[in-house]
Amino acid sequence: MERKLMSLLPSISLSEMEPNSTLGNHNSNRSCTTENFKREFYPIVYLVIFIWGALGNGFSIYVFLKPYKKSTSVNVFMLNLAISDLLFTITLPFRVDYYLRGSNXIFGDTPCRIMSYSMYVNMYSSIYFLTVLSVVRFLATVHPFRLLHTTSIKNAWILCGVIWIFIMASSTVLLKNGSEQKDNVTLCLELNSNKVTKLKTMNYVALVVGFVLPFGTLSICYLLIIRALLKVEVPESGLRLSHRKALITVIIALIIFLLCFLPYHVLRTLHLLEWKADKCKDRLHKAVAVTLALAAANSCFNPFLYYFAGENFKDRLKSALRKGRPQKTRCGFSVCVWLKKETRV
């Protein structure tokens, strides 16, 4: 019990916290479910997220890893964010198959554990990487020279390592909760009535540490950037590049938080507070199902962050795309002049 409560982040979002209809007795409650909704909704949404997330983040990783003349700490954070998204999207086909079969897992116990583990590792690592990105971008506009050493490539990798270790270590409890056999059906990703009370307490900690604090930090960064822009005399050509990138980074991060993470954390909390073994709340179950899909969709929105706010990402992208094109033949000045004369009509 104490070991589980010490796991602050994804461990609080156990697989049992996913929207489910398994209420008490399995036989009597199969009729009071959102099974049909999940069977129709999840496979389509997860398949779209898988295709776009795998292509977008896979190609982004390729662009980030291509040799380039200049690399920054921002690129390091974005690369780790893309890796987290790609690792998560790889597990989505298993979720698609599970819901297409009417919430029946056929791949065994291990994939069931990994599905829950990857979902929440991705969610909270994304939250922390987005928050760190916004803070670094904000501080770069306020103390650009003082933070030159602090935001070095080496320190960026160290910070990413700390985030990975913290999130993955606190999520290990998810690997202890696998599939469950009931009435010739192998259940996975289901809410267990025996653990609701404990999950309520754990959810509150996750809500504060995993969402409220990062979201509050993002909001403060946004307000302080606006304040800094109002104080600084903006040249006629427009915003200074560092200010513009900082503002774009925080705005996109806030949009992802508001669209993907806020609805899920609010409805997940409400779902646990309202959950009772003898009552069926189809509307709430469906709402939580939709917000869970939105949380998973964060991996589709992050590539837009790389493109619009990434450090040299557009230049890296152009360089990567030019590699496959045939190079123009170069010639000496005298030869080119001769060719021009000979081909003149």
Curated annotation (Swiss-Prot):
Alphabetized Pfam families for the sequence: 7tm_1 (PF00001)
Cystines in this chain: C112-C188
Intervals, Cytoplasmic compartment: 65-73, 146-154, 227-246, 309-345
Matches recorded under InterPro entries: CLT2_recept, Cyst_leuk_rcpt, GPCR_Rhodpsn, GPCR_Rhodpsn_7TM
Transmembrane segments: 44-64, 74-94, 125-145, 155-175, 206-226, 247-267, 288-308
Keyword annotations: Cell membrane, Disulfide bond, G-protein coupled receptor, Glycoprotein, Membrane, Receptor, Transducer, Transmembrane, Transmembrane helix
Cell compartments where the protein resides: Cell membrane
Biological processes per GO annotation: neuropeptide signaling pathway
Main localization (coarse): membrane
CDD domains: 7tmA_CysLTR2
Database matches in SUPFAM superfamilies: Family A G protein-coupled receptor-like
Gene Ontology annotations for the cellular component aspect, listed alphabetically: plasma membrane
Its membrane topology: Multi-pass membrane protein
Residue positions with a glycan: N20, N29, N177, N184
Plastid listed as a keyword: no
Residue spans, topological domain Extracellular: 1-43, 95-124, 176-205, 268-287
Gene Ontology molecular function: any one: G protein-coupled peptide receptor activity
Free-text function comment from the UniProt entry: Receptor for cysteinyl leukotrienes. The response is mediated via a G-protein that activates a phosphatidylinositol-calcium second messenger system.
Family: Belongs to the G-protein coupled receptor 1 family.
Protein name per its UniProtKB record: Cysteinyl leukotriene receptor 2
Provenance organism: Sus scrofa (Pig)
Gene that this sequence comes from: CYSLTR2
